[in-house]
């Protein structure tokens, strides 16, 4: 019986394998040969869906990492009645994920996939830089707009600058992921999250 072709499933397999490959080896170090082997397809099947490696990288950003930011930050903060409580929950959830995931496959050894792409590819390719800029802007706006709404309802201090606070939180999360993959020590992540948690608590009116 001939095998039924499923283009959507094939494309998804390629993206999943590409995400893992780029996360572990970087975009430039990522191997098309390893991707097709991991996906169980031919190079012809891969290039049927993606014109080249850059297009594949763009798709990973658009279809994997953008939704991840939406899931972790944008959706929880959207119309949040108490943004400080939501930020508490996000930080707690993030630390729990790092503690429970396989270290060699996750943040502890590999860092943040968005940060990895940003550091490696933003200086080299405008398509990557623009997409990454959009991701960071979305992340930043989700925090700053939530804090502004919190100020309007007096659950966030009126004397803080939501834009600056969002910049700080994005920076500490991104920075901890980047430095953390060098230290490869759980204690480092715990310390960074603890500092972020202390700072979040300082946003509550006294």
Description of each model-found segment:
Residues 15, 61-65, 129-140, 166:
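Amphipathic, non-transmembrane alpha-helical scaffold segments
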Residues 89-144:
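Short secondary-structure transition hinges
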Residues 51-55, 59, 78-81, 122-126, ...:
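Residues in soluble alpha-helical coiled-coils and helical-bundle/repeat scaffolds
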Residues 120, 175-178:
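Structural signal for membrane-spanning alpha-helices in multi-pass inner-membrane proteins
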Residues 2, 13, 17, 21-63:
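Helix-turn-helix
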Residues 59, 74-110, 162-169:
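Hydrophobic alpha-helical connector segments
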Residues 1, 89-101, 137-155, 163, ...:
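C-terminal peripheral helix-coil segments that are non-catalytic and often amphipathic
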């Amino acid at each position: 019986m001939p095998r039924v072709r499923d283009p959507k499933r094939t494309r998804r397999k390629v993206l999943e394998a590409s995400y893992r490959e780029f996360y572990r080896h970087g975009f430039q170090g990522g191997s098309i040969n390893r991707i097709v082997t991991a996906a169980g397809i031919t190079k012809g099947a891969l290039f049927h869906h993606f014109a080249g490696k850059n297009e594949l990288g763009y798709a990973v950003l658009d279809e994997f990492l953008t939704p991840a930011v939406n899931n972790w930050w944008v959706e929880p903060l959207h119309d949040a009645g108490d943004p400080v409580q939501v930020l508490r929950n996000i930080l707690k959830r993030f630390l729990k994920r790092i503690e429970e995931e396989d270290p060699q496959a996750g943040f502890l050894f590999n860092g943040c996939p968005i940060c990895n792409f940003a550091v490696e590819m933003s200086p080299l390719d405008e398509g990557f830089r623009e997409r990454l800029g959009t991701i960071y802007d979305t992340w930043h706006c989700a925090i700053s707009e939530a804090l502004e709404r919190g100020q309007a309802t007096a659950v966030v201090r009126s004397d803080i600058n939501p834009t600056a606070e969002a910049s700080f939180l994005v920076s500490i999360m991104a920075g901890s992921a980047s430095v953390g993959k060098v230290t490869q020590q759980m204690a480092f992540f715990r310390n960074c999250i603890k500092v972020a948690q202390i700072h979040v608590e300082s946003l509550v009116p006294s």
